[in-house]
Amino acid sequence: MPRYYEDKPEGGACAGVKEDLGLCLLQSDCVLKEGKSPRQCLKEGNCKALKYSFFECKRSMLDARSRFRGRKGY
């Protein structure tokens, strides 16, 4: 779920997806209850949809076709 804040400055490409991925990992049971690091929880498969969205956004920055279509993500 995207979280938009009007008073936040623009962070660059894929910043919204990156921020939401970080929040998802920090609020997951893996981090809160099991005490693991967000990196370990990401490798275990938590927040898969946001991880995939972040990957697609980063990949679209390298894709030559995206210059005309725009970046994927928000």
UniProtKB/Swiss-Prot annotation:
Disulfide bonds join 30-57, 41-47. GO terms for biological process: leukocyte differentiation; mitochondrial cytochrome c oxidase assembly; multicellular organism growth; spleen development; thymus development. Keywords: Disulfide bond, Phosphoprotein. InterPro entries: Cyt_c_oxidase_assmbl_Pet191 (IPR018793). GO terms for cellular component: mitochondrion. The keyword Disulfide bond applies. A motif (Cx9C motif) lies at residues 47-57. The keyword Disulfide bond applies. Coiled coil: none annotated. Belongs to the PET191 family. Involved in an early step of the mitochondrial complex IV assembly process. This is Cytochrome c oxidase assembly factor 5. It comes from Bos taurus (Bovine). The gene is COA5.
